[in-house]
Amino acid sequence: MSTAEAGGVFHRARGRTLDAFSSEKEREWKGPFYFIQGADPQFGLMKAWATGDCDNGGDEWEQEIRLAEQAVQAINKLNPKPKFFVLCGDLVHAMPGRPWRKEQTEDLQRVLRTVDSDIPLVLVSGNHDVGNVPTPETIAEFQRTWGDDYFSFWVGGVLFLVLNSQFLYDASRCPALKQEHDHWLDQQLRIAGQRACRHAVVFQHIPLFLQSIGEDDDYFNLTKSVRKEMADKFVEAGVKAVFSGHYHRNAGGTYRNLDMVVSSAIGCQLGTDTHGLRVVVVTAEKITHRYYSLDELSEKGIEDDLMDLLKEN
C-alpha cells in the first residue's frame, strides 16, 4: 500500500489539529464519554528482544500483527463506540533509515485501516518513529507517513494535546523545530489555563516519570529538570492527566494534582503485564482509567462500573 493510499486514515492530523473533530462544535461539554489508549505496537521488537539484538534485530513481526489485529477487533466490538483510539508512539520498531521499516509500517497500516471508520485514530510519535535524536528529515518522514507529529483537538469540551516527546529528550539536531513545538505548547497551555475547557489531557510517548517526580533519570523517563518544568507547566494550566507508553509496563503516579499514566504495550512486554489497552472514561469532574488485557477486553468488554460512569449527567 502506498503512503498516498493510506493518507485518508492516517493524515487526519494536519495544520496542528485533527480533522476528525470540529473544534467549533466540540468546544462544549456534552456529557461523559470514553476513549481507548494503546501504546507500542512496535512491530519487530519481540523478535529483536528475544534474540538480544534490539539495534539490528526485528526481521519478523507476525506476533505483533496478530496482537494489533486482536486490539482492533476488541475496539471495534465495543458498544457504545469510543470517541477515538490513541496510539502513544513506537508504532514500529525499525528506526528511521533501518531495514524493515517500510515493511513494518505497511503491515501496521494494513491492520489499522480495519479500525471502525467511526473511531478516529490519534497517532503519537515515539522514539522509534522519529529517532532517539530526531532530525528535520526524520520528523518530515513521520509527517508524510502518519500526519503531524504534534497537534491539539477538542472532544466534548475537553482539550487534548499531542506532544512530540523526543523534543523534550534530545532536540540537539533540530533546535528550530523544538522551539516551534515549545511555542505552540505554551499557546495551547494558555488556552487550558484560562479554563476554557472542561479538562485538558496530554498524550506523549515518553513519560514525565514512572512513579514519582523525584526519581532518578532513566532511559524510560524524562530528565529531572525537564520533567519538573513540564509537570509544573501542566499543573499550572490545569492539565488533569498525561498518558504515555515507552515503558512496556504499567506504571505511573501523581504530582500535585496531575495524574501521570504509563500504559503497557500492545506489543512486546518487558515486565509482567499482559498485552493490552487502557479504557479512559471522562466525566464532568474526573478522568477514570483502567488497563485491560486484550483477552479481557475482547471477551468481556468494559466492566459495568465504568459503563455506569458514562450514564452520569
UniProtKB/Swiss-Prot annotation:
GO terms for molecular function: metal ion binding; protein serine/threonine phosphatase activity. Its cofactor is a divalent metal cation. A divalent metal cation 2 binds at residues 90, 127, 246. It is found in: Cytoplasm. Keywords: Cytoplasm, Hydrolase, Metal-binding, Phosphoprotein. It catalyses: O-phospho-L-seryl-[protein] + H2O = L-seryl-[protein] + phosphate; O-phospho-L-threonyl-[protein] + H2O = L-threonyl-[protein] + phosphate. The modification Phosphoserine is found at residues 2, 293. Its EC number is 3.1.3.16. Residues 47-250 are annotated as: Catalytic. Belongs to the metallophosphoesterase superfamily. CPPED1 family. PANTHER family: METALLOPHOSPHOESTERASE, CALCINEURIN SUPERFAMILY, SERINE_THREONINE-PROTEIN PHOSPHATASE CPPED1. Protein phosphatase that dephosphorylates AKT family kinase specifically at 'Ser-473', blocking cell cycle progression and promoting cell apoptosis. May play an inhibitory role in glucose uptake by adipocytes. This is Serine/threonine-protein phosphatase CPPED1. It comes from Bos taurus (Bovine). The gene is CPPED1.
